[in-house]
């Protein structure tokens, strides 16, 4: 079976690597254009492009696939390339570009998507973040047949994965990426054998909106449990944060703990090597165990307090 693969970040690169290791022929990879990154803002290839080039797989990087969009000539070239490349199916994982119907219609066996949630829950851009932030007990991966709607297509496979109390978006991402790679290989093997029934998604969809940097600010009037989930959900991006004496401090790890104090939300209850950093919340308190100030490294609470005083301070 010949596969065109479309994806961009590390999540997609794991799936591409799994397909390559399983022996599937991959005549073409689509990925987003190189983007400026790092302090020097130099152009960097996506994780998918890096894997493809390392394994001599041809790469195309159209800026758009919409014939009626801003770059119709680029889109037309991409359409022509797909039609000229012999393949059976397209596998899509976190590609980042909208696939119009004219693209979905090209692969003889359609387009199959790897989505990091238990559809129809958490359709959209940030399913891993939102699952942790909302306190879901589990998530998983859904393999679906793509159609024009956003993550609305019939399901071909689904596997569940528990969300542990210390999972961050980073750790859960890695687990789901590995699971997605395993599942797409299994799904395509079943497709080769002609055994791939599709199941319509049930009702009850909700949407995982894109993460905005503005969401990163912690509101200490909220319950500690809610804030602890947010800190885990926003690790590594964009990093939950609060301001103390005009300095923006990022919170990377924290646990909710009971607290009977009457201190105002955001007030530092304790900040010492024995107790760590304890911050009053609307309900309970946060025990913060890893912090970072601007331009600095992530530090344990003990190390952080050696260079920054929080005793009797209040976070805003």
Curated annotation (Swiss-Prot):
Can you tell me which residues bind (6S)-5,6,7,8-tetrahydrofolate?
Answer: 117-120
**Which Gene Ontology cellular component terms are annotated?**
cytosol
Class in the EC hierarchy, top level? transferase
List the catalytic activities from the record. L-methionyl-tRNA(fMet) + (6R)-10-formyltetrahydrofolate = N-formyl-L-methionyl-tRNA(fMet) + (6S)-5,6,7,8-tetrahydrofolate + H(+)
GO-annotated molecular function: methionyl-tRNA formyltransferase activity
Q: Which domain of life is it from?
A: Bacteria
EC numbers on record? 2.1.2.9
Pfam families from the UniProt entry = Formyl_trans_C (PF02911), Formyl_trans_N (PF00551)
UniProt keyword annotation of Transferase present: yes
UniProtKB keywords: Protein biosynthesis, Transferase
**Chain's role:** Attaches a formyl group to the free amino group of methionyl-tRNA(fMet). The formyl group appears to play a dual role in the initiator identity of N-formylmethionyl-tRNA by promoting its recognition by IF2 and preventing the misappropriation of this tRNA by the elongation apparatus.
Q: Which family does it belong to?
A: Belongs to the Fmt family.
Protein's name in the database: Methionyl-tRNA formyltransferase
Species this chain originates from: Janthinobacterium sp. (strain Marseille)
- Please name the taxonomic classification of the source: Bacteria, Pseudomonadati, Pseudomonadota, Betaproteobacteria, Burkholderiales
Please name the gene that encodes this protein: fmt
